[in-house]
A protein has these predicted regions:
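Nucleotide/phosphate-binding catalytic cleft detector across ATP-hydrolyzing
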Residues: 1-28, 38-233
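Conserved Rossmann-like nucleotide-cofactor binding loop
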Residues: 33
Length: 233
């Protein structure tokens, strides 16, 4: 009878668990594809209910650490001697490529297919190598690594991170100002993005991976459900 009861709510379990641990906080979960930015005030979850409403409020950002097309994160980049260059809208590189190049994730963390996986049949180790990731990043400016050089490829990766940090910080500052929140609690594989955004806003940062470990933090909704069920029964 209520179609909203079937809506995507894995974030709700995490937020419910966090609300019982930290009464006033911005809960952020940066995953492979999306980012949840959930205000918790006085132990109450203040987030909107549907994905549409959360997208409008900035509580859901459709951008993550692995699967996001670089072309949805950036429209232009600086390469070479600070030359501005538009980028292609094709799926040439994803955020996993940027963070592999920058050293924030490993080849094992790169759990999705790369945009050019078809070219690496049976050679996944090569597909998820740093040099292959730099080659994919060079393609977003319709070039290759030989033309733009490794420094420019790394520069593109750094600009991807800078853009994602800025977008997250913009959502966080809205909630900070609206609810007077001064702490962010972070889960997911993108802890490093959240920390940088929190530092830029001078907000206290708490990483759940430092408490529960990286594996639990990366799958925090499942962990939260298990803990909530224990309390229920």
């Amino acid at each position: 009878k209520d179609p909203l009861s079937f809506a995507s709510t894995n974030w709700l379990a995490s937020a419910k668990f966090i609300s019982g641990q930290y009464g006033d906080a911005i809960f952020v979960d940066v995953g492979s594809t999306t980012t949840d930015v959930i205000p918790v005030v006085g132990g109450e979850i203040k987030a909107k209910r549907t994905d549409l409403e959360r997208l409008k409020s900035g509580e859901l950002i459709y951008s993550g650490i692995l699967r996001t097309n670089v072309a949805t994160v950036l429209k232009k980049v600086e390469i070479g001697d600070n030359e501005e260059c538009s980028i292609s809208s094709e799926l040439f590189a994803i955020t996993a490529d940027a963070y592999l190049v920058l050293g924030y994730i490993t080849a094992d963390d790169y759990s999705c297919e790369s945009p050019d996986s078809y070219a690496f049949a049976g050679r996944e180790k090569e597909e998820k190598s740093r040099i292959s990731a730099m080659r994919r990043l060079s393609r977003v400016v319709c070039s290759d690594l030989e033309e733009i050089g490794e420094d420019s490829a790394v520069g593109i990766a750094e600009q991807v991170k800078k853009a994602q940090v800025a977008r997250l910080a913009a959502s966080m500052v809205r909630l900070k100002e609206k609810y007077g929140l001064e702490m962010v609690v972070s889960a997911g594989i993108g802890d490093f993005i959240v920390k940088e955004a929190a530092d830029s806003l001078n907000i206290q940062f708490l990483s759940l991976s430092s408490i529960y470990g990286k594996k639990i933090s990366a799958a925090f909704p499942a962990y939260a459900v298990s803990k909530l069920l224990v309390k229920l029964f």
